[in-house]
Structures are given as C-alpha cells and as structure tokens.
Amino acid sequence: MKELEYPFDAAYIIKKRKSLKKALLADGTSRIRKKIAVFGGSTTSDIVKTLELFLLDAGIEPEFYESEYAQYFQDAMFPDETLLSFKPDIVFIHTTNRNVTDWPEMTDTTEQIDEKLHTEINRFTAMWKSIAEKFHCPIIQNNFEMPLYRLLGSRDAWDIHGRTNFLTRLNEAFYAYARENESFYIHDLNFVSADYGLKEWSNPLFWNMYKYAMCFEAIPSFAFSVSHIIKSIFGKNKKALALDLDNTLWGGVVGDDGVDGIEIGQETGVSQSYYEFQTYVKQLKSLGIVLTICSKNDHENAIAGLNHPEGALRPDDFVIIKANWENKDRNIAETAAELNILPDSIVFADDNPAEREIVRTQIKGAAVPDMDGVENYITTIDRSGFFEVTTFSEDDLKRNEMYKKNALRAAEMASFGDYNDYLKSLEMHAVIDDFIPVYLARITQLTNKSNQFNVTTRRYTPAEMESVFEDDGYIRLYGKLIDKFGDNGVVSVVIGRKNGTALDIDLWLMSCRVLKRDMEFAMLDRLVERCREVGVETINGYYYPTAKNKMVSDLFDRFGFTKTEENEDGSTVWQLRVADYKPQNHVIEVFGNDHAEA
C-alpha cells in the first residue's frame, strides 16, 4: 500500500488507521496468520494498532495479546491462563529507558554501579529465559534509547556515573545475549529514536500525560521498524534488487553522454553520491541479495557504463542484465521467471516516476520505492526494510554466484534435444542425510523463505528446529546438490513425524533454484530407504494450498502416492505404501553425511 511505504506521512497513518486497515483486509491478498504477544513497559495500544497495518501490508495477519500497562515482567515470569492459551508465535518486549529501575548516583562506588547494572541485566535475562521456556517462540527485545538530557554533558558517555554510559553498558549486555541465543532479536530502538530526532522522540509531555515512551507522531516510525524484524523472521523479506542505470546507478544518460560523460566517482558531489549508492548496492550483494539490471538502454552501452573505471559495480555483480527497449514490467516479470522467484520478491529501483508507476501497477506485490534524489537513494532502500537481516548463512554469501551458475545451466540445456540427457550431462551428485549441526541455520532459513515448492508452508524458529533435531520421533532429511558448475548448497528439507508404523510429512520443501533437476525424487528415494530402516510402512503426505504453492499441488501424485482425502479448501491427503515403492531418481548420485563437504 502506497500510504505505508517509506517515506510515509505519520500523521495521515494515525488519522486514517481504520480506513487503511479496512482497505488492506479487502485487497484480496493471501496472508499468513501469526499470534504476537506485546509485553509493554509503557502504553502500547496505538503501537499495536499501527504495527498491525504494516504487518498486513507485509502479508502477515496478526492477532495480538497486550499486557496490561507496565506488566511486562509479570507476564513474562508468571503468565496467566489467557496468555498461556494464546500461545504466541512471537513475543515483543517493548521496554525503554523509562523502565530502568535503579540509576547510578554520583556518590555510588564502582562496585555499587556494577551491582545495579547486573541487577538490571539479570531481571531481563530472567524474563527472556522464562519466555523461551514457556512459549518456545522468537523474542524481540528493544535495546535502550539514549537519555534526553546528560547530567554530565559529554562526560556522561564515558563516566560510569552517567546515564548514557549505563544504558550503553546495558545495551552491550543485551547484544551479548543475542549473539548466544538464535531465537532472540534486538530491535534497535536506539537507532530509530536517534534517526527520528531524540529531542522530539523523548518529549516528556507524552510520558507525563499518557505514559507513552515516545511522542505520538513517532509511533508509525517505531512500528514500521518493528514490523521489519517480524516479517523477516516469518520469511517475508524481498530477495532481489532490480536496478535502472541512467540517473540511478550513475548520473546522466550513457547512450547520449558516452561513458566519459556520465557522473560516477570522486570528482564532484553528485558523482560521489552515485558512487556511494553503487557501494551500498554491492554491500547488499554480500548479504545474498540478488542483483539484476532492468534498463531501457542498448546492451553494449549498459555494459560500458558498468565498466566505468570509477564505478564500484561491474557487470559480473549482476545475475541478470536486461538492457533493452522492452517495457520494464515485462523485463521484471521475465527476471522473476528466470530466477525462479515470484515477482513480489523483487524491489525495483528507478529514478523515473513513470517507469515506477508502470511496474507498480502491472507487477503485483513488487516493491517500488520512490527514488527521489540520489542523495536519498540509500536511505530510501535502507529505511524501507526490504532486506532486514535476522538470519545469515554461508549460502547467503554465495547466492549471486549460485544464480549465475543457474544461467550457465540454462544455456547448456538449450543445446540438448533430450531433457534427460541434459540432466545426465550436469554430472549431479547430492548429499542427502539426517540433519547435522553445521546446516541447521540454513535449514531453518529455508523453512521461512521457501514459498512455492513447499507443500505445507510450515515455518520453524531456530528453537523449534533445534527441538526437531534432538527428537528421535522424527525422520529428518536435508539435501545438498552439487554439479559440474558448482555447489548449490542446501536446497531441500523433509521432516516427517513417526506415528506408529506411519510417517506424517510435516514439511517438504525445495529451493526454486533447483527446480526440474529431479532432486525431489532423490529426496523421496532416500526417505523411503530411511522408512524401511526404522519400520515405517506407510507415508502420509499433506498439501495445504496457499497463494504461492500451486506448483506442488500434484507433487504427491507425481511421486506415486494415492489421494485419500480432498477438502473444500483445496487441501489434500496422500498415502504411499513403502513396500510398493520403486526408486525414481536416475540422474543424481547420492551420498551421506560423510560427503557433506563435497
């Protein structure tokens, strides 16, 4: 929704909250439903109402539990039956520096200040552990914003008696906990408040009158920031950035001005701004964001511009370069198809408002930020939260290279008349075996990112995946596919729950970058083999339809399962007798965990 895109009108959002919600719920978007518990150290009602808008816009339909005013500690430590039965999917602890209970005094000794610090840390740590034990769900915790005033002036930052120093030390303790606990996430309230303007943010009037820990007008900025973490946890991040060239990655028009005439580099303020934006884009690539070009240009001119000696980006930084004179909405759609991702996974960055509007109206779900002035490009993409990082794996570092190799595979496929011959030519081998610790982060990440080849679309938090990993009641398989072009990484996951002599499939997913490679048959062969080893006689498969997973509606039929149930909502149940199964993979050589690093 345009009204909820950065930069938004906070006053408008607050005023039109009800009508915006009504419009979002009526837009026909398929959303995942999530329960969110908000434990507040201050008034949270308007925060929750505004957060709901941003989550609906991100494809999440939230149901909220709100603690009573300042009852965050009690709810965390001693939840009542209402909260226990609510069973949140995520807990957000909204505390601020207003909730620090014992500040340093100028007369305190170092030991006394350290004791106060540890008391605060222990209070929060006890809450976090209690929530983890009782609810087994992700926790989002604000860090602390800096104080509105500094009693010691600049000395407040480094003197242990200063509140600024005390809050900084508390924040460092929070960060240390986050580094050691995978399902624990810090919401950077300190940054958001500073970005907004601490003087306005911390206006005492709103605390004294309404017990708000921020000014009323800051609530949309705060809720927007929180929504980024929630949508990232639940797999709603964007995956690719499609960029225009002229006046987006450099100043000027390369076809008219020539390579020597475009503005990029260190010579002028404008050229520096474009260089900084290119540098930022290259940093996004290092996070696993797929970079593509979508520009109305001659291909040769585009390549020449990207090879400018003062630029930070080069042609090989991009997986796909569409520099032609086709409509950009068509190029975006083709880019999505070639990457095997949905169009709503793409962010399109273009300085031209007319081109932006065409893509915005023609490509449903694609993010199209208003790129207003090169000096604002980085801020616009950064603050929009398209690529909020909550997990990071080795595969993220290699993602652009993996997609490039897929392009090489596609080119080779075109030279074969028989598809099976093409598959054999890839010289594929796979590691398919029980989960091992080194891949748990990637496996968890896949469950929250894979939407198309995913029969149940069940999501797992790191804590939930750890529980599955340790439970002998499951059969677990991950699949890692390698071919002559390179390593695709972990691309498939199957989780089945043993139920007597039956196995119920809780999860079956595969990355779209290895579609049509017969990897699913290799996974099935290994699953049946494992079932035979442990005495499982039947495998029950389940398909739950979503707006994005139609491609696997007939997966179990293709596997040779028999349909046993079909419901009005389109969900189906399937069954396979293990004794009747014959192997179906004939093109991938399969190994176990002893070849995991192959």
Model-derived features: where do they sit?
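Extracellular glycan-modifying ectodomains
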Residues: M1-A242, L249-W250, G255-G261, A354, ...
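Terminal substrate-recognition subdomain of acyl/acetyltransferases
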Residues: R360, K364-L426, E529-A598
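Basic, amphipathic juxtamembrane/active-site segments
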Residues: V254-T279, K364-M371
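Short hydrophobic/aromatic-enriched beta-strand-loop microsegments
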Residues: E61-F64, P315-V319, A366-G373
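Acyl-donor binding region in acyl/amide transferases
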Residues: K484, V490-N567
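Substrate-recognition element of Asp-dependent hydrolases with the DxDx(T/V) motif
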Residues: E276-N307, I321-K322, V359, Y439, ...
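Conserved Lys-Pro-Asp/Glu-containing loop-to-beta segment of HAD-superfamily phosphomonoesterases
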Residues: I332-P353, V359
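A conserved beta-strand-loop-helix scaffold within acyl/acetyltransferase catalytic domains
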Residues: V431-R513
